[in-house]
Amino acid sequence: SAASDVYKRQDFDLITSTHLRGTFFCCQKIGEIMLERGYGKIINLGSTWGYTTDAKKAPYCMAKAGIAHMSRAISTEWAPNGIRINTLAPTGTVTEFTQKTWESMPERAKGILSRIKLGRFAYPSDHLGAAIFLASSASDFITGQTIYVDGGFTAAG
């Protein structure tokens, strides 16, 4: 993370390439198969940062917002062919990587946690229900949506 006025081009390119370009071309590749079959479900990974913002996160916030918008855009193209595309947008989730990051930046972790109304960070298992729902026939009439699994993070603004 860096302030927008000093963000390095190579860091910007890495963030946007990984998240936007990577997601787009994954959709394109799997979409070829699904379009042939006439059915499929794609669940893209967004973030609460695609809806809200924070200092020194502009490229990441932009990329995650772009994923949600891209999912909506492609869903309008492929829905007539039976393809549903949605975005799952989690909040801060406890992983080996995030634990190390939060330990090295405790004030940052505290700030994020203060925005999660359920009072704790998510665990990967917290995202399972939404992912299973989006992958199941229970969501057959849902496309182009973003599901926030965030413990109230986005509700707080």
Label each region the model flagged.
Residues 32, 76-80, 140:
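Alpha-helical segment proximal to the catalytic Tyr-Lys
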Residues 49, 53-61, 73, 100:
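Active-site loop-to-helix junction immediately N-terminal to the catalytic Tyr of the SDR YXXXK motif
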Residues 80, 92-116, 156-157:
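A glycine/serine/threonine-rich, flexible loop-to-helix segment
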Residues 2-7:
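Short, small-residue-biased leader/transition segments that mark boundaries at the very start
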Residues 52, 132, 143-157:
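Short C-terminal tail/terminal secondary-structure segment
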Residues 27, 63, 71:
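Active-site helix of classical SDR
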Residues 116-127, 138:
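A conserved structural motif in NAD(P)-dependent oxidoreductases
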Residues 8-25, 39, 43, 60, ...:
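Catalytic Tyr-X3-Lys loop
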